[in-house]
């Protein structure tokens, strides 16, 4: 059987969510790094954008969050009850629409970096830290879900893209987020992915 393939640029950005997910779930996949969108791949891109996920059965899917939910749903990683699944969706939307978009806007100079400290950290990261302290898992229940993975990726990513944010977030300031980070990075598949993840000039 053909291995699943994830195609994305040689940067972290939106490709980080499904890459970390596939690694965490120990799915053997082809991590296909793309230099540019050309005629060899454009016909497979419904909206002209990467990432592109090609499953082992030939099914193709674009949009990072849709890809992640599709993979997670195949491996019982989206919550067990309707309430847990709704909380997973709620968290994914907050990460993808609010936090991640804002990080990129600050990185590109569209938003003032002070807003990271004034809005993003107290409204989102502090709240997630609080929930993790109260419930251990962001969607409740008794196991990790895609919600936890998404918050981990955002927590790791913001310090990479915006170094000033690392001083505001890390070093014990949010211990439950630190524990979440430790959980995912101690996973064998994730650790291997992080070890071999390419370093590029485009810090995004």
Swiss-Prot record:
The keyword Transferase applies. Signal peptide: none annotated. Glutathione binds at residues 8, 49-50, 63-64. The keyword Cell inner membrane does not apply. CDD domains: GST_C_Sigma_like, GST_N_Sigma_like. InterPro entries: Glutathione-S-Trfase_C-like, Glutathione-S-Trfase_C_sf, Glutathione_S-Trfase, Glutathione_S-Trfase_N, GST_C, GST_superfamily, Thioredoxin-like_sf. Transmembrane segments: none annotated. Residues 2-79 form the GST N-terminal domain. GO terms for molecular function: glutathione transferase activity. It holds the Pfam family GST_N. It catalyses: RX + glutathione = an S-substituted glutathione + a halide anion + H(+). Its EC number is 2.5.1.18. The modification N-acetylthreonine is found at residue 2. GO terms for biological process: glutathione metabolic process; response to curcumin. Residues 81-202 form the GST C-terminal domain. Keywords: Acetylation, Transferase. Belongs to the GST superfamily. Alpha family. Conjugation of reduced glutathione to a wide number of exogenous and endogenous hydrophobic electrophiles. This is Putative glutathione S-transferase alpha-3.
